[in-house]
Amino acid sequence: MSAAESPSPLIAVDAIADGAFAEAEVCVDGDHESAVLYRQGESVRGWLNICPHAGRRLDWAPGQFLKSREGHLVCAAHGASFSLEDGECVAGPCKGDALRAVALQLRDGQVYLA
Protein backbone atom coordinates (compact mmCIF):
# COMPACT_ATOMS: atom_id res chain seq x y z
CA MET A 1 0.00 0.00 0.00
CA SER A 2 1.39 3.40 -0.87
CA ALA A 3 1.20 6.64 1.07
CA ALA A 4 -1.23 7.93 -1.56
CA GLU A 5 -3.62 5.05 -0.71
CA SER A 6 -3.15 5.55 3.04
CA PRO A 7 -3.24 9.28 3.74
CA SER A 8 -3.34 8.80 7.51
CA PRO A 9 0.02 9.00 9.26
CA LEU A 10 1.20 6.05 11.32
CA ILE A 11 2.66 8.24 14.06
CA ALA A 12 4.24 11.65 14.59
CA VAL A 13 8.04 11.58 14.40
CA ASP A 14 8.21 13.46 17.72
CA ALA A 15 6.13 10.72 19.39
CA ILE A 16 9.17 8.44 19.07
CA ALA A 17 12.06 9.48 21.30
CA ASP A 18 15.44 9.61 19.56
CA GLY A 19 17.04 6.17 19.85
CA ALA A 20 13.75 4.56 20.87
CA PHE A 21 11.10 2.27 19.41
CA ALA A 22 7.37 2.52 18.78
CA GLU A 23 4.77 0.13 17.47
CA ALA A 24 2.40 0.96 14.63
CA GLU A 25 -0.22 -1.02 12.73
CA VAL A 26 0.50 -1.20 9.00
CA CYS A 27 -1.29 -2.78 6.06
CA VAL A 28 1.13 -4.88 3.99
CA ASP A 29 -0.12 -6.93 1.04
CA GLY A 30 -3.68 -6.51 2.31
CA ASP A 31 -2.89 -7.81 5.81
CA HIS A 32 -2.86 -5.68 8.96
CA GLU A 33 0.42 -6.27 10.76
CA SER A 34 2.27 -4.89 13.75
CA ALA A 35 5.44 -2.98 12.87
CA VAL A 36 8.34 -1.84 14.99
CA LEU A 37 9.56 1.67 14.22
CA TYR A 38 12.98 2.96 15.28
CA ARG A 39 13.95 6.61 15.31
CA GLN A 40 17.53 7.78 14.89
CA GLY A 41 17.75 11.56 14.68
CA GLU A 42 15.42 12.68 11.94
CA SER A 43 15.16 9.25 10.28
CA VAL A 44 12.73 6.45 11.10
CA ARG A 45 13.19 2.83 10.03
CA GLY A 46 10.54 0.13 10.20
CA TRP A 47 10.22 -3.65 10.14
CA LEU A 48 7.39 -6.09 10.67
CA ASN A 49 7.17 -7.04 14.33
CA ILE A 50 7.90 -10.70 13.53
CA CYS A 51 11.10 -12.58 14.35
CA PRO A 52 12.27 -14.71 11.40
CA HIS A 53 13.38 -17.45 13.81
CA ALA A 54 9.99 -18.67 15.04
CA GLY A 55 7.47 -16.13 13.78
CA ARG A 56 6.91 -14.65 17.24
CA ARG A 57 6.50 -10.96 18.00
CA LEU A 58 9.69 -9.11 18.92
CA ASP A 59 8.20 -7.05 21.76
CA TRP A 60 8.02 -8.39 25.33
CA ALA A 61 4.71 -6.56 25.87
CA PRO A 62 2.68 -4.69 23.25
CA GLY A 63 4.86 -1.83 21.99
CA GLN A 64 7.69 -2.58 24.45
CA PHE A 65 10.95 -3.50 22.71
CA LEU A 66 14.37 -4.48 24.07
CA LYS A 67 17.59 -2.78 22.97
CA SER A 68 20.95 -4.35 23.80
CA ARG A 69 23.99 -2.50 25.13
CA GLU A 70 25.46 -2.97 21.65
CA GLY A 71 22.53 -1.05 20.19
CA HIS A 72 20.61 -3.95 18.63
CA LEU A 73 16.90 -4.74 18.67
CA VAL A 74 16.49 -7.94 20.70
CA CYS A 75 13.69 -10.47 20.25
CA ALA A 76 12.07 -11.02 23.64
CA ALA A 77 11.22 -14.67 22.87
CA HIS A 78 14.62 -16.20 22.04
CA GLY A 79 17.17 -13.37 22.26
CA ALA A 80 17.98 -12.90 18.58
CA SER A 81 19.71 -9.53 18.01
CA PHE A 82 19.00 -7.39 14.95
CA SER A 83 20.98 -4.52 13.45
CA LEU A 84 19.08 -1.24 13.56
CA GLU A 85 20.69 -0.25 10.27
CA ASP A 86 19.27 -3.01 8.07
CA GLY A 87 17.35 -5.45 10.29
CA GLU A 88 19.87 -8.27 9.80
CA CYS A 89 20.13 -10.81 12.62
CA VAL A 90 23.67 -10.45 13.98
CA ALA A 91 23.40 -12.95 16.86
CA GLY A 92 21.07 -15.68 18.03
CA PRO A 93 19.12 -18.55 16.51
CA CYS A 94 18.39 -16.84 13.17
CA LYS A 95 21.83 -15.28 12.53
CA GLY A 96 22.10 -14.25 8.88
CA ASP A 97 18.33 -13.87 8.41
CA ALA A 98 16.71 -10.43 8.48
CA LEU A 99 13.56 -8.70 9.58
CA ARG A 100 11.12 -7.78 6.80
CA ALA A 101 11.53 -4.05 6.17
CA VAL A 102 8.55 -1.71 5.96
CA ALA A 103 9.13 1.23 3.59
CA LEU A 104 8.40 4.52 5.33
CA GLN A 105 8.20 8.14 4.28
CA LEU A 106 8.49 11.21 6.51
CA ARG A 107 6.36 14.25 5.63
CA ASP A 108 5.52 17.29 7.72
CA GLY A 109 6.75 15.65 10.92
CA GLN A 110 4.65 12.51 10.37
CA VAL A 111 5.56 8.91 9.47
CA TYR A 112 3.65 7.33 6.55
CA LEU A 113 3.90 4.07 4.64
CA ALA A 114 5.88 4.71 1.45
PLM segments and residue spans:
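N-terminal pre-ligand scaffold of iron-sulfur
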Residues: 1-68, 83-84, 98-114
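Short cysteine clusters
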Residues: 51, 75-78
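Short cysteine/histidine-rich metal-coordination sites, predominantly Zn2+-binding motifs
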Residues: 65-73, 89-97
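Short beta-strand His + acidic residue motifs that chelate non-heme Fe in jelly-roll/DSBH
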Residues: 82-83, 91
